[in-house]
C-alpha cells in the first residue's frame, strides 16, 4: 500500500488538463452490453473504477481492448447473462449500472450489491421501482439483486427523488423494451446527456435527456459506434478550487464551462478571479478570500461531489461560512481529518460551520472516500509543513494521475510505500 506525501505552502501555477468524466465512464462502459457489435469509447479516464468495469465485462464474455489516446473498445457479441453475485462487483459503487444493461439485453441479471464510497444510505429503491414498472421481477437474496423478466414493456415512471443513478439505469433497461417509456422527475446532469448520446449513436430513440422528462421509444437491437466522453466537471471543479486555495494562477484545460457555472459563481462570490473561455477556465487565487455559504443541490446546483474540497478552501476565508449537504448528509468524514490540521469546523446535522482564516498544519490524515481524499490533498497543498495522506485507493478511483498533474503545477507531492507497521496502525485506527 502507498501513502501520499505533500509539502504545502507553495503557490501553484500553470495548466492542468482534465480527463474524461468518471461519472459518465462508469455508466457508458456497462451501456456497451446493449450493443450487438463493438463500441469504441474515447477519452476514458485511467482510474481504478474503469479498469474494474472492464474486468467485469470480460467476466461475462466481452472482449475489452485499450487503444491509443485513452480509447476503450468493447466487443459485446459473445457476452452472456452470467450471474455476478460476488467479487469485483461488490467493490464498485457504479456496478449497479450492470443491472439495467444486462436486464435490457438478456432480460435477467444477478448483481452483488455495490460498494464504493460509504456515504450513508444510498438506496437503490428508485432503480428497482423502475425495473419493476418495465415488467421485471426483482428480489434481494444474500446481498445480491436478482432480476428476471419474460419481456420488458415501456412504462411511465415517476422518480420520487431525483436520482442520476436511477435515471441512467432505467434508460439502459428501457432502450430495448417494447413500446414507449417516460421517465418523469428525471435527473438533468450532463452525464445523463452523455449516456443518452452514446445510446442514440447505437440506434436508441431517446428524447429529452437533460430535462426532467425523458421519452424512450424501444428498439429491437442496438449496434456499435464511436463515442467520446465529456470532460470530468468534478475533476475540473476540484482543480479550480485548488487553484484558488494555493494562491497561484491555474488554468484548467479541457472543460465545458457551462457545466461548472455554480462553482464559478461561488468562487467569484468568495472574491476569486475566474476567467472562462471555450474550453478553459483560469482561476487566480492571490486575493483575500471572503467567506460564502454553500448548499449542495442536484444539477445545475452546487455539486455534492465538490462540497468537501470547497470546505477546505473556506478554512482560508475571512469569517464563518456554512456548508450544507442536502444530497448526502453523511458526507462529513473529512472534517475530523481537517481538524487535525488545525481547521476550525463544527458539524451540526447536515451542515459544517467553518471559521477562518486559519493556517493549516501538515499532519497524518486518512481519506475515507473519494472526494474527502481530494479535500485532504488540497488541505495538504495549503498547509505549513508535510501532510501524509493514506487511503489512496479512494483517490485513485476518481482522479487520473493526480500526482503527475499536480507536479506539473509546481506542487511538491510524491507517493511512498507504507511500512508493515504503518499499515497495521492504519487498520487499527
UniProtKB/Swiss-Prot annotation:
- Binding-site residues for phosphoenolpyruvate, renumbered to this chain: 22-23
Which family does the UniProt entry place this protein in? Belongs to the EPSP synthase family. MurA subfamily.
Lineage, highest ranks first: Bacteria, Bacillati, Bacillota, Bacilli, Bacillales
Sorted alphabetically, the Gene Ontology cellular component annotations on this record are:
cytoplasm
Do you know which Pfam families this protein is assigned to?
EPSP_synthase
Localization: Cytoplasm
The EC code for this enzyme is 2.5.1.7
Superkingdom of origin:
Bacteria
Record GO biological process:
cell division; cell wall organization; peptidoglycan biosynthetic process; regulation of cell shape; UDP-N-acetylgalactosamine biosynthetic process
Where does it mainly reside?
cytoplasm
Keyword Cell wall biogenesis/degradation part of the UniProt annotation: yes
2-(S-cysteinyl)pyruvic acid O-phosphothioketal occurs at which residues?
117
Catalyses which reaction(s)? phosphoenolpyruvate + UDP-N-acetyl-alpha-D-glucosamine = UDP-N-acetyl-3-O-(1-carboxyvinyl)-alpha-D-glucosamine + phosphate
Summarizing the function annotation, the protein's role is: Cell wall formation. Adds enolpyruvyl to UDP-N-acetylglucosamine.
Q: What is this protein called?
A: UDP-N-acetylglucosamine 1-carboxyvinyltransferase 2
Coiled-coil portions: none
